[in-house]
Amino acid sequence: MARGFTVGFDPLGLGELSSGSLSSVSSRGHLGSDSGSTATRYLLRKQQRLLNGPSRGIRASSPMGRVILINSPIEANSDESDIIHAVRVEKSPSGRLGFSVRGGSEHGLGIFVSKVEEGSSAERAGLCVGDKITEVNGLSLESTTMGSAVRLLTSSSCLHMMVRRMGRVPGIKFSKEKTTWVDVVNRRLVVEKCSSTPSDRSSEDGVRRIVHLYTTSDDFCLGFNIRGGKEFGLGIYVSKVDHGGLAEENGIKVGDQVLAANGVRFDDISHSQAVEVLKGQTHIMLTIKETGRYPAYKEMVSEYCWLDRLSNGVLQQLSPASESSSSVSSYASSAPCSSGSLPSDRMDVCLGPEEPTSHGPGWGRADTAMQTEPDLDSRVETWCSVRPTVILRDTAIRSDGPSSTRHLDSALSESPKTALLLALSRPRTPITRSQSHLTLWEEKKQRKKEKSGSSGEKGALQRSKTLMNLFFKGGRQGRPAGDGHREAWTLDSRSPTKVRPRLDLEKAGSVGPVQKFVTWRLRRDRERGRALLSARSGSPSGQAPTVNEQVQAWESRRPLIQDLARRLLTDDEVLAVTRHCSRYVHEGGVEDLVRPLLAILDRPTKLLLLRDIRSVVAPTDLGRFDSMVMPVELEAFEALKSRAVGPSALRPTRQDTPPKRHLITPVPDSRGGFYLLPVNSSEDEDGEIREKLGVLKVSLGASAPHHKGIPPLQDVPVDAFSLRRGACAPPPQPPPVAPRPPRPNWLLTEPLSREDTQQNQSQTPAQSCSRSRSRSRSRSHSRGQGKSPGRRRSPSPAPIATAATANGRYHRPRKARPLLPRLLDGQVAKVGARQGPLENGRIAEEAVGNVSTGALRTITLSKMKQSLGISISGGIESKVQPMVKIEKIFPGGAAFLCGDLQAGFELVAVDGESLEQVTHQRAVDTIRRAYRNKAREPMELVVRVPGPGLLPLASDLRVVKDQSLAPDCPSALGPVDDARILTQLPPPEARQLQQSLSSALKVPQSIPKLSPILKDPHDPS
């Protein structure tokens, strides 16, 4: 004992312990000495436990002396867990860490390193299989789930980890359901480690006998309780015997097993069927076997074991002697359990990754095959309950009514096992019969009968009020009872104004939920009755309120009800509600009040008025009023609740707002419906959704059950998260299906080129300002608030057309429209401008309706993608763009993968339903409904491709300027197009349009190239 020892402890891992220091530092612990220092090591550990307290688990003593280990740590007896190392792991250039982890708080474990790749950065840093990661970058991983640990490990490129060199990896294996039995002889709990019952193992040991029980139909009471059944995998056992009952007189004891009853075998029968057999006849012949125990509860437990790391890195299950021996058994400390009566029968479960062949043969063998041979030694494995404890039903066979099934009181603060032990330690109390709660009037009546001493009434059964009487008679104060008194209200002799309920349930001992509900209902009715009786100074009796009192109460509540009604209803509806309430107060009839109110209050928000109207209803009519109104109020509450948490509804576009843009992306919500994603959140949510899906994939893989209801352990590769997260940024671009034509509205979004910049520098400041203002308005699609550039007086003979004239409608100069790429519409508006505002609008509408602006084309696309992926704009309510057009196509959607749809196409029809002359909201709903209908595949879109009647774009004008409009050079609008356009217009207008087109092609150098060139109407020539 006097021999010295040294302590080798390296918390930061700064120094490695050499193999030559084995004399001072043990290979399996932080204490080092020779073989004679066992007592010293034991004393030091005991002193450390006294100073620091229980470090890995809390041991609590039960009332019967049983020791329970809480938190079930599986590394409780491991000496290597105190060796702490600091490891610094950096990601490789490819972004890999090179190790996998296992465990998590969802399994009651820490985070363990289960695999380390050869040549990886983790192996070079010194990370080993079997290390328990306790800290990462200053954050503790104790009591951390696997998902949180993986997110923390992949969040940084450099990991500073504190690990415990355990040298082993936790495995998991599952046992069958364990049944806890109550030993009647020794009054203790015995845990059975296999699914077979003691009667099955020792069927010949018990003494069998036949018992005859005779009862009558009037007084059917066998006097015992049964427990068990086929649904629990057990037989039928006697769990309780009434003191002095029929069963006790015939020798039936607690712990006897019922093998048969009247020829019906009970070895394979459910609990409810056994109750029916025992309560079916007056003469019952029971076959009884003495077992001395009955089942208490069942639970599913999981047993953890260790996988040891060999010298070559392969995991192998430890021997029984080296496994953890932390006791979590619920055996009593004095419960003898021989190996012959309770053999160990465990079930082998294969655990491992989803693809065992992806690793080497050693890994696949170690993770998927764990040999769990039954062992009869004194080995107690670490286990924890993974399912809630099932308390077996206990049914009393003693009455002709419904079977009274009782459970243990779940309100106790102790666990079910401790509650059972406390119940076993208490002395047995004889069975006493108690009647239901009686009213005060019935108690007085019963005392009068007892005082009268009538022999004929003493033996009769006194029945108390039933639940039906309490609900439908006790709650109505105006109905008289049998002797003429009011049943629900009575007067206190000491206080004439104090009204108290008849049902004084608090004095009757234990109060159940039904009695509490009845008491609460009576108190509520009493408070409402007092509110109606508050106008009176005092009353000698507790009668129902009169008509005058109801009128006074209505007049006091009328301003509040009318104020709330004006907020929710129209003026006519407010008058109607007031009229019906006044009629009810003066004439009565709750049905005549409820029916018109429900017809008026046809919206969920309007039904909120019923809460205030309920205060006007008389207490005698509240039951009928609630029965008629309550279902409607519940539906309204559900509707308001779903509306509060649901997506915001799309409202129709106003007349003074620009066209709306909506991303047609039907995404299912939690209620099975669909809603649209915002336009600006598609790219942001794409990465978030992929990241969430990645996390879900790992969590689902980690919790994929290999056994019913049991989550097994799996290795989670850390690099899979980092690689998946890095791959989410650039979405793959599919190859183009066909060469796409230039976008029709690219003039609005194309930046200025070098030639444009040079030209802007050479022009006058007024011209540059005019061009910049027109471009800014075209890009933002907003209405002009100041003066339009097209209305400025210019020395050139041709003014600049605005969106007001380009769309064929006449507006004042201060309300100019942004530019639209339509030369033909501008010419028609120019022609009609000479005939006045009214004729201008009519002629422009006729021209736009007659002239075809593009060819129709049918495009089909698949509905297999989750999102259609387009943004639309326009609608019949918009003056700028009455047609529905595709504003933008988003990558990844069905429209993008189709390859035929382009931004600027006009949508004519979707799946046979027309989109012409419809509102913006109607178009959104139509497209969403068509894409959601997966029965019609594929989706057919009829679009109008923009024709050649567009404005010359920037590139076209630049070509015209460079070539100086050579006479032999064909223009953007060829002769064929001019002839086609002119044949569709009236002859006078065609001639004017032809002159305008010919003059428009002669573009002077001083005119801005981005504006259409028209003939000046003020030119005298």
Swiss-Prot record:
It comes from Mus musculus. The lineage of its organism: Eukaryota, Metazoa, Chordata, Craniata, Vertebrata. Disruption phenotype: Mutant mice exhibit congenital profound deafness and normal vestibular function. They show disorganized stereocilia bundles with a reduction in mechanotransduction currents and sensitivity in cochlear outer cells. Knockout mice have normal vision function from rod and cone photoreceptors. Homodimerizes (via PDZ2 domain). Component of USH2 complex, composed of ADGRV1, PDZD7, USH2A and WHRN. Interacts (via PDZ domains) with WHRN; the interaction is direct. Interacts with USH1G. Interacts with ADGRV1 (via the cytoplasmic region). Interacts with USH2A (via the cytoplasmic region). Interacts with MYO7A (via MyTH4-FERM domains). One of its GO terms (cellular component) is ciliary basal body. SMART domains: PDZ. The keyword Transport does not apply. This is PDZ domain-containing protein 7. The gene is Pdzd7. Residues 758-767 have a biased composition (Polar residues). It is found in: Cell projection, Cilium; Nucleus; Cell projection, Stereocilium. One of its GO terms (biological process) is establishment of protein localization.
